[in-house]
Structure formats: structure tokens, C-alpha cells
């Protein structure tokens, strides 16, 4: 079994999301023209949690959507290797993003490739006024010039490690762990 070190427990995740919610509100001077878009899979659940906290803090309902970046990735995955048909899950943005301040939400920022794909997918939906990035964990090792605007926790890692965020909505656990790939 691979060695796992817990770097964020359930309480730390909750605190980080609350802080990020306040930062989003402060930087955008409220919630006017603000929208949250979660990157599948865990980014969707984190966007929903940020939405809930912003609603509690400001009393304003911010639109929330989700984006599937499957067709925009440079490491496309397939549901069937024989047909080479991509595994597409669908995008759900039930509001106009034109002129909005969109906050893309993801669980872990690593190379920046997922975020680049998400921005490409978002631009195919519309033209936001601004795109910001919120992540629960930033582990470094960027390959592209991408930086998160809102970070729950910076988690430095080596090339042999990966950060895995587990949410009860998907994983039946609530934490962030560093996993050593060599153990």
C-alpha cells in the first residue's frame, strides 16, 4: 500500500473554503456579476461549497455551473480503446457567462494543463469579463504560466508524490493527502 500523509483534514478543508469565499468576495467587491464554475469532478463539489459559503456570508445567490474539459485536454482519455471514443461527461453552465467575473474552481493545481483546458472550454461557452482560479491545493510543478488567484493551501511536493483531495460527496472521506508514488 502506498504511504499517505494527511495534510488537510475535514476541519482544515472547511476553514480553507471559508477563507477563500471571503477572499473571492473581497477581491470582487461583492458578488455582482460573479459566477462559479467547477471543473469536473471534485471542482464541481468545491464550487457548490463555495457557493453555499458566499450565500451565507453575503446573502446573495451566485450562479454555479460545471465544465467538462475532456475534449480540450492534451492527454485525452477514452471510454473505449477500440473505438477511441472520448469519455465525455457534459458541461452544465445554465447562465450567460458573457461579461461575468468567472471563478474556475478545481481541487488541485499541478502542471496547469487542466486549467488551460478549462479556460479553452469556457471560452467556447462565452466571453467572461474576467477568469479567476480557485483551488483547494496548489502543489507546484507548473508546466504552463498559470497561477491560482485563491488557494486553500500550498502543499509543496516532490516529483515522486501526488496530492489527492477526497470529498465525502465522491470518495467517502474528507481530507487531502500526499501519496508517495514509489512506496
From Swiss-Prot:
It is an enzyme of class 2 (transferase). One of its GO terms (molecular function) is uracil phosphoribosyltransferase activity. Keywords: Glycosyltransferase, RNA-binding, Transcription, Transcription regulation, Transcription termination, Transferase. One of its GO terms (biological process) is DNA-templated transcription termination. Its EC number is 2.4.2.9. Disulfide bonds: none annotated. It comes from the Bacteria. A motif (PRPP-binding) lies at residues 102-114. It catalyses: UMP + diphosphate = 5-phospho-alpha-D-ribose 1-diphosphate + uracil. Homodimer and homohexamer; in equilibrium. Belongs to the purine/pyrimidine phosphoribosyltransferase family. PyrR subfamily. Regulates transcriptional attenuation of the pyrimidine nucleotide (pyr) operon by binding in a uridine-dependent manner to specific sites on pyr mRNA. This disrupts an antiterminator hairpin in the RNA and favors formation of a downstream transcription terminator, leading to a reduced expression of downstream genes. This is Bifunctional protein PyrR. It comes from Listeria welshimeri serovar 6b (strain ATCC 35897 / DSM 20650 / CCUG 15529 / CIP 8149 / NCTC 11857 / SLCC 5334 / V8).
Amino acid at each position: 500500500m502506498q504511504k499517505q500523509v494527511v495534510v488537510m483534514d475535514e476541519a482544515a478543508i472547511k476553514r480553507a473554503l471559508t477563507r477563500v469565499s471571503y477572499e473571492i468576495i473581497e477581491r470582487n467587491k461583492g458578488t455582482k456579476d460573479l459566477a462559479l464554475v467547477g471543473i469536473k469532478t471534485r471542482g464541481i463539489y468545491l464550487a457548490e461549497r463555495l457557493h453555499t459559503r458566499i450565500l451565507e456570508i453575503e446573502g446573495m445567490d451566485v450562479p454555479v455551473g460545471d465544465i467538462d474539459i475532456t475534449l480540450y485536454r492534451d492527454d485525452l482519455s477514452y471510454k473505449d480503446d477500440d473505438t477511441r471514443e472520448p469519455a465525455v461527461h457534459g458541461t452544465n453552465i445554465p447562465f450567460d457567462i458573457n461579461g461575468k467575473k468567472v471563478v474556475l474552481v478545481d481541487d488541485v493545481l499541478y502542471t496547469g494543463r487542466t486549467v488551460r483546458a478549462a479556460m479553452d472550454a469556457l471560452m467556447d461557452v462565452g466571453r467572461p469579463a474576467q477568469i479567476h482560479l480557485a483551488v483547494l491545493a496548489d502543489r507546484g510543478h507548473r508546466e504552463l504560466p498559470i497561477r491560482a488567484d485563491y488557494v486553500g493551501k500550498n502543499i509543496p511536493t516532490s516529483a515522486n508524490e501526488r496530492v489527492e483531495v477526497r470529498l465525502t460527496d465522491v470518495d467517502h472521506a474528507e481530507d487531502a493527502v500526499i501519496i508517495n508514488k514509489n512506496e
